[in-house]
Amino acid sequence: MKKIWLALAGLVLAFSASAAQYEDGKQYTTLEKPVAGAPQVLEFFSFFCPHCYQFEEVLHISDNVKKKLPEGVKMTKYHVNFMGGDLGKELTQAWAVAMALGVEDKVTVPLFEGVQKTQTIRSASDIRDVFINAGIKGEEYDAAWNSFVVKSLVAQQEKAAADVQLRGVPAMFVNGKYQLNPQGMDTSNMDVFVQQYADTVKYLSEKK
């Protein structure tokens, strides 16, 4: 009986220690106004944002978060309009096209690099070329660009950003209740930071 009690006590302590790793106001913050019906895990980004580029291409935050998510929990990525002027809005629509066609993974890197690294993306035509070079037919892209589905996805992205009163990117939200706070995480080591970020998302996705 004593051994069983000690084992149970150990489990309780382990659980308490695990929960204590995550503190509201440290690794995450609770939204004042929860957003009903928000995607389970929602990341906002811009192809114009240098930190978003780092998150995607250097730290691989999205990939690491996806690996940690419980079964059945989906991650969604939305592009924002408030960077890049008119071209930023074109990229939000292009991201809606990517979502509609299911080609996000094919165009993410070339769009980031075309905007920030090579600076070869300067117009809607340049964006279209990225999709064609990624294997999407021009007529398929054009049909999607002008479709009701894409227009709806653009509106959906804009509404989601307004609902959480988004101030900057990159930003990640969980269940419309919590926002990740990278500044409250361990940044002394890149791998540790990425691990803590992904673990925090997992914790919040399971939080009742």
Curated annotation (Swiss-Prot):
It comes from the Bacteria. The keyword Phosphoprotein does not apply. GO terms for molecular function: disulfide oxidoreductase activity. Keywords: Disulfide bond, Periplasm, Redox-active center, Signal. The keyword Signal applies. Residues 1-19 form the signal peptide. Residues 20-150 form the Thioredoxin domain. PROSITE patterns: THIOREDOXIN_1, THIOREDOXIN_2. Disulfide bonds join C49-C52. It is found in: Periplasm. GO terms for cellular component: periplasmic space. PANTHER family: THIOL:DISULFIDE INTERCHANGE PROTEIN DSBA. NCBIfam families: PRK10954.1. Belongs to the thioredoxin family. DsbA subfamily. Required for disulfide bond formation in some periplasmic proteins such as PhoA or OmpA. Acts by transferring its disulfide bond to other proteins and is reduced in the process. DsbA is reoxidized by DsbB. It is required for pilus biogenesis. This is Thiol:disulfide interchange protein DsbA. It comes from Escherichia coli O6:H1 (strain CFT073 / ATCC 700928 / UPEC). The lineage of its organism: Bacteria, Pseudomonadati, Pseudomonadota, Gammaproteobacteria, Enterobacterales.
